[in-house]
Swiss-Prot record:
InterPro entries: NA-bd_OB-fold (IPR012340), RNA-binding_domain_S1_IF1 (IPR006196), S1_domain (IPR003029), TIF_IF1 (IPR004368). It comes from Caldicellulosiruptor saccharolyticus (strain ATCC 43494 / DSM 8903 / Tp8T 6331). CDD domains: S1_IF1. This is Translation initiation factor IF-1. It comes from the Bacteria. Its main location: cytoplasm. It is found in: Cytoplasm. GO terms for cellular component: cytosol. Belongs to the IF-1 family. Component of the 30S ribosomal translation pre-initiation complex which assembles on the 30S ribosome in the order IF-2 and IF-3, IF-1 and N-formylmethionyl-tRNA(fMet); mRNA recruitment can occur at any time during PIC assembly. The gene is infA.
């Protein structure tokens, strides 16, 4: 899967789950289960409930995603 195939959406972190997983409420109302991308993990970016994030979704499974950016 190339970078052009992913869908990027914004949302708000609702809940922090074990193993660096997060429940994210997207702006369109859907909830997805997302994990932290490698670059955010490598740079020790902390993600807390209430943070605005950008999530990449695969077109094959729209219920899981990857958090690639955190804003305040």
């Amino acid at each position: 899967m190339s970078k052009e195939d992913v869908i990027e959406l914004e949302g708000t972190v609702i809940e922090a789950l074990p193993n660096a997983m997060f429940q994210v409420q997207l702006d369109n109302g859907h909830k997805v289960l997302a994990h932290v991308s490698g670059k955010l993990r490598m740079n020790f970016i902390r993600i807390l409930p209430g943070d605005r994030v950008v999530v990449q979704l695969s077109p094959y499974d729209l219920t899981r995603g990857r958090i690639v950016w955190r804003s305040k």
